[in-house]
Swiss-Prot record:
Protein's name in the database: Putative septation protein SpoVG
InterPro entries given in the database record: SpoVG, SpoVG_sf
Superkingdom as given in the UniProt entry: Bacteria
Gene Ontology biological process: division septum assembly; sporulation resulting in formation of a cellular spore
NCBIfam families recorded: PRK13259.1
Pfam families attached to this UniProt entry: SpoVG
Record flagged with keyword Protein transport: no
Function field: Could be involved in septation.
Record family assignment: Belongs to the SpoVG family.
Length: 89
């Protein structure tokens, strides 16, 4: 699996949700609505999710391995930092 594109679709300077991102894998599969969120320990990547009737949030798509999660997180956070720098400049 290779991440071939990361597009930051929306950047929020205020609030805990900082960005909405789309991640493309192998130029063949895209996951939309990946979020960059500011938590207590800094920024983290939240996968797209839906709210269940019980009020819980369940991931729609998510990485299976820790290595894949790390690759996605690094790529998304790097793209977010670049988008943030160009938005401020």
């Amino acid at each position: 699996m290779t991440i071939t594109d990361v597009r930051v679709r929306k950047v929020n300077l205020e609030g805990k949700m900082k960005a909405i991102v789309s991640v493309t894998f192998d130029n063949a599969f895209v996951v939309h609505d990946v979020k960059v969120v500011e938590g207590q320990k800094g920024l983290f990547v939240a996968m797209p999710s839906r709210r269940t009737p019980e009020g819980e949030y369940r991931d729609i798509a998510h990485p299976i391995s820790a290595k894949a999660r790390e690759q996605i997180s690094v790529a998304v956070l790097n793209a977010y930092q670049e988008a943030l720098a160009s938005a401020i400049a």
